Amino acid sequence: MFKKINTKLTIDGLELLQSLGDCSIDLCFFDPQYRGVLDKMHYGNEGERQKGRSVLVQMSESTIIYFIQEISRVLKPSRYLMLWIDKFHLCEGVRPWLDSTSLEIVDLITWDKMKMGMGYRTRKQSEYLLIVQKKPIKAKGTWKLHNIRDVCSEKIPQNELKTHPHSKPKTLQKTLIESCTNIGDLVCDPAAGSFSVLECCKELGRNFIGTNLESS
């Protein structure tokens, strides 16, 4: 297993996952860096925040599938992958990403970002967190908190968005870590961005292993 836990690694996420042993991770977060709806709709004016996203290392669909296959391998049985997707991928479907894995979609949380984005018709104000579980599928003993709603309203501070345009809601992440892991468990984030998951793990007494590779 890769030994550098609780640090901000800058290696390739696949390299990190490949260094981990089978069934060694208690929880994984994954925010694939795809342009998704931006590429599909060809927006002419993306704005400063979306320009920031465009300089991040982008992942092809085949790369995302490879990540998820590795995540399936390293997750312990009945443990969870928290998979971030946008509206485009929610509508188009991501089920093929899970083919050839032991993973199944078991739930969905909508994140209301409390700030309007782009859109030719409706303006985009939400992202979606697919809750994916490794077989065998079961809720009892794997999900401790039962006050988590399927809609989360949480705004990211503007100064954080300028530095990390793909930042995710820390309070929601912290609640999910608390619900799905125990003290001392190992949480993985192979595309860690601002490393907010690391911050949550430190506050909750969990161990973290993750990396963020940005374009030069």
Question: What is the meaning of each model-derived region?
Answer:
Residues 1-30, 203:
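SAM-dependent nucleic-acid methyltransferase catalytic core
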Residues 8-11, 54-65, 163-171:
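Conserved phosphate-coordination/catalytic loops
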Residues 15, 88-90, 216:
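Short alpha-helical
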Residues 17, 38, 91:
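Glycine/Thr-rich phosphate-binding loops of Rossmann-like dinucleotide-binding domains
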Residues 17-18, 72, 174-178:
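Generic structural signal for well-ordered alpha-helical scaffold segments
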Residues 21-79, 204:
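SAM-dependent methyltransferase catalytic-core segment centered on the flexible catalytic loop
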Residues 34, 38-46, 96-216:
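Class I S-adenosyl-L-methionine
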Residues 57-114:
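Conserved Class I SAM-dependent methyltransferase catalytic core
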